[in-house]
């Protein structure tokens, strides 16, 4: 299998910006958030199960999952959160493995927000953490998602702390305000990852 770089960070850290910078260099992406959306589109067994469990109110008028309402329900009810996780996590994991196995590039960026929380570190060859202060996270989430401070606090409380995430980092990108610094940092890491991927390929070939 291709060399796997897990790209992780808290909500509002700018993972998508960093992932897109790698994609601009021709690096393939496997994004857990996109997979999580794809497995609950209308007509999927997962969306049917969620609708049966929570009722039709959990759908938008056009039949899609009302993600904001679901998030509200599970962040205030641990039992419901566990139910949703037990339904979706195996499906996300299965589809992630399928996509990763199809990659033929030297390495892949696996965008996985809850890498630390869901104890998935063993599936990656290397971990890249997008780091940002909690204050900037809160500001970005409020602006982007239009949710209130209490909901943001609930989301942050459910995620690994900044220090926990950094403890597992092999590499770090600081994504506070200096957007100009991102491109050269990503280019530098890209070269490093190509070397690591080649070294791993040689090791596997020698075994």
Curated annotation (Swiss-Prot):
Q: Where in the cell is it found?
A: Cytoplasm
GO MF terms on file? ATP binding; dephospho-CoA kinase activity
One GO CC term on file: cytoplasm
What this protein catalyses is: 3'-dephospho-CoA + ATP = ADP + CoA + H(+)
Q: Which residues bind ATP?
A: 12-17
Q: In which pathway does it act?
A: Cofactor biosynthesis; coenzyme A biosynthesis; CoA from (R)-pantothenate: step 5/5
UniProt keyword annotations, A-Z = ATP-binding, Coenzyme A biosynthesis, Cytoplasm, Kinase, Nucleotide-binding, Transferase
UniProt GO BP: coenzyme A biosynthetic process
Among Gene3D superfamilies, the record links this protein to: P-loop containing nucleotide triphosphate hydrolases
Domain DPCK as annotated: residue spans: 4-200
- One of the Pfam families matching this protein, by short name: CoaE
Concerning InterPro entries, the annotation shows: Depp_CoAkinase, P-loop_NTPase
Q: Which domain of life is it from?
A: Bacteria
User: What is this protein's function?
Assistant: Catalyzes the phosphorylation of the 3'-hydroxyl group of dephosphocoenzyme A to form coenzyme A.
- Please name the NCBIfam families in this protein's record: dephospho-CoA kinase
Q: Which family does it belong to?
A: Belongs to the CoaE family.
Write down what this protein is called. Answer: Dephospho-CoA kinase
């Amino acid at each position: 299998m291709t060399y796997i770089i897990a790209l992780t960070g808290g909500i509002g850290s700018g993972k998508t910006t960093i992932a897109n910078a790698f994609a601009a260099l021709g690096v393939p992406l496997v994004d857990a958030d996109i997979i999580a959306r794809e497995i609950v589109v209308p007509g999927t067994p997962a969306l049917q199960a969620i609708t049966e469990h929570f009722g039709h109110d959990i759908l938008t008028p056009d039949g899609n999952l009302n993600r904001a309402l679901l998030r509200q329900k599970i962040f205030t009810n641990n039992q419901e959160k566990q139910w949703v996780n037990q339904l979706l996590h195996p499906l996300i994991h299965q589809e992630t493995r399928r996509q990763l196995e199809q990659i033929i590039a030297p390495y892949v960026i696996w965008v996985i927000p809850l890498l630390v929380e869901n104890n998935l570190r063993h599936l990656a060859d290397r971990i890249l953490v997008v780091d940002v202060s909690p204050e900037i996270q809160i500001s970005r989430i409020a602006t982007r998602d239009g949710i209130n401070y209490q909901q943001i606090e609930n989301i942050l409380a459910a995620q690994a702390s900044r220090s926990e995430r950094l403890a597992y980092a092999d590499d770090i990108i600081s994504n506070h305000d200096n957007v100009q610094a991102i491109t050269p940092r990503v280019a530098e890491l890209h070269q490093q990852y190509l070397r690591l991927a080649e070294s791993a390929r040689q090791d596997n070939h020698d075994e």
